[in-house]
Amino acid sequence: MNARLDATRVASILARVAQARPRVHCLTNTVAQNVTANMLLAFGAIPSMAVHPDEVADVAAAAGAILINLGTISPEGERAIPRLLELARAQGKPLVLDPVFVELSPLRMRLAEDILRLPGIVVRGNGGEMQALAPLLAATPGATRITTGAVDRIEAPSGLFEIAHGHPLMTKVTGLGCASSALVAACCAVEPDPGLAAGAALTAFGIAGEIAAERSAGPGSFAMHLIDALASLDEATLLTRMG
Amino acid sequence: MNARLDATRVASILARVAQARPRVHCLTNTVAQNVTANMLLAFGAIPSMAVHPDEVADVAAAAGAILINLGTISPEGERAIPRLLELARAQGKPLVLDPVFVELSPLRMRLAEDILRLPGIVVRGNGGEMQALAPLLAATPGATRITTGAVDRIEAPSGLFEIAHGHPLMTKVTGLGCASSALVAACCAVEPDPGLAAGAALTAFGIAGEIAAERSAGPGSFAMHLIDALASLDEATLLTRMG
Amino acid sequence: MNARLDATRVASILARVAQARPRVHCLTNTVAQNVTANMLLAFGAIPSMAVHPDEVADVAAAAGAILINLGTISPEGERAIPRLLELARAQGKPLVLDPVFVELSPLRMRLAEDILRLPGIVVRGNGGEMQALAPLLAATPGATRITTGAVDRIEAPSGLFEIAHGHPLMTKVTGLGCASSALVAACCAVEPDPGLAAGAALTAFGIAGEIAAERSAGPGSFAMHLIDALASLDEATLLTRMG
């Protein structure tokens, strides 16, 4: 099923990120900002995180992709969202939505409804979040839906991809799912097929997680090893790990 | 004095947290959010950190306990506080106040005054913060007062507890005191006696700190080891360390 | 050129920080808050990070120095800036500006223009940021301009200092430049010559970075080792590393 997503293809997309160094503008929650920025840097991309409605479009204008993560959304972040949507629409810029805890908040559900109207939207959430969004997503043709878990499932216009990498410790560290959404955005900045882009990002993230788990003494040391592993991931490692 | 807080009792409260996996809704400062969330996850609890006044009550509604930490309070966070107080009052949900730097800010003192009106409130601060609040606390019957330091002192309706665990490095890492307040909240979600709940949380936190200090090369590596130690703390370790 | 900035001079300024334990009030971006606070603590200083316009001047009033960092500036942070400028002006308190991504945001450029009117202002940015500010800085007599990079260049009223310490990994971890600005502020709290203060801070920071690079397996573990190295930096190490 993943014939089109072998180690060579993943390595090629990662190499394009490392060469192009795309900036990913992240309107993201304050809990995950730091680990998200460090993960993007380790991946070869550049983070920017402006949130002020009066500057967010200026700062995001030259970014290669945009991430909107609804965790700890603030009133100012809420006002920044339409600016980013307008920019993404006008420039055809890739945009990834991470609907953190959307199942708990009617406010986030309303914001997600607006965001999902963007053509070509990519959404990454966990099982509960994606289930809560299912009725909206059913009415969103052309969206790429990514449900992460023990096996990540990517439903893209170009087909279905499943990624079976990663480690349970990844659910014990805050912000890692959020950071993986930023990696998906970074790959979307260099690869026009969002299914392949998401597949490459989540394969790299999952394999870095496997390596980190072998080196960690628990959830405290895990994120550090994950970032180190991501920064040194090469095609040989991908080949070995992807079998 | 701590006859009722031996290793078996502490282990029993920790086991209830690990089994019930209570969600702790944290309205907390942006400096400490990440380490607080990771500490709660290592403890077996689930963090949520919404702050927007239009959603904070929705997100906190099904949480097992609430933490209000006044560090980096924002105008929106200020407006979120009454929503959380109303929720805690209506549901009888445990609420912990962490009055960061209250001695420096008349705004925080006013907010603390409102929060302390909540029946059954639990307050954890350092010596300076608790001293600044002393006049207010004197007029707050039924409150549980926790002053942390070289020896943590817990004055609860059920009695006095003193915890002599921990390490000086814990004062050299930002957000650890804030995170300990979140652990107190997690224990309050499963243990109705706030004195015992706070005692169990601070014993676990202090012992994890002792273990981390033995493994750390300085304050940079300390938090990581603390989280690793907290995630693997078991009754045998508690027994050994509590003598 | 740096005859006045030998290891003994640097050690003397660091010792004054460790003894006076100045509080540095940081109005800084939410991405860098945690690493900035931990770096200040490792340096022997105390961080405070209030941002609410109704309390920021109260909290900063007794601080030894102020940092204003424009990253992730919020509407409330924008309103806090004039309160901090008024305080710095009234008390003659040192103030450091970190103009993150000022080249991307007309809003930040306007804010920087206001801040640069403060007599004795110290500015630290990377090459792109300092170049964008060059026209404003040309009209700012008495300012200290710090351009960090492979070689840090400090142009102070008392002369020119160049610091050739550090490691490329320092650009791969988010918030380290921001944290270095906070260290400059901490030194300005104890040393009246901002050129010497900045030189001492950036020498310590750069040498800690060199030590960290020798101990790190990548950007994930780098910040931890940098903070450990900063916390244990002594005159003997400075002497060896400064040749």
Per-range role (PLM):
Chain A
Residues 2-97:
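Conserved N-terminal subdomain of the carbohydrate kinase-like
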Residues 5-8, 207-243:
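Charged C-terminal helix
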Residues 21, 63-64, 119-120, 142-143:
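Short, well-ordered alpha-helix to beta-strand connector turns
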Residues 28-33, 168-181:
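Glycine/serine-rich anion-binding loops at beta->alpha junctions
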Residues 56, 65-137, 147:
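Conserved beta-alpha-beta core of the PfkB/ribokinase-like small-molecule kinase fold
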Residues 122, 134-172:
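Conserved phosphate-donor
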Residues 174-207:
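Short, small-residue alpha-helix embedded
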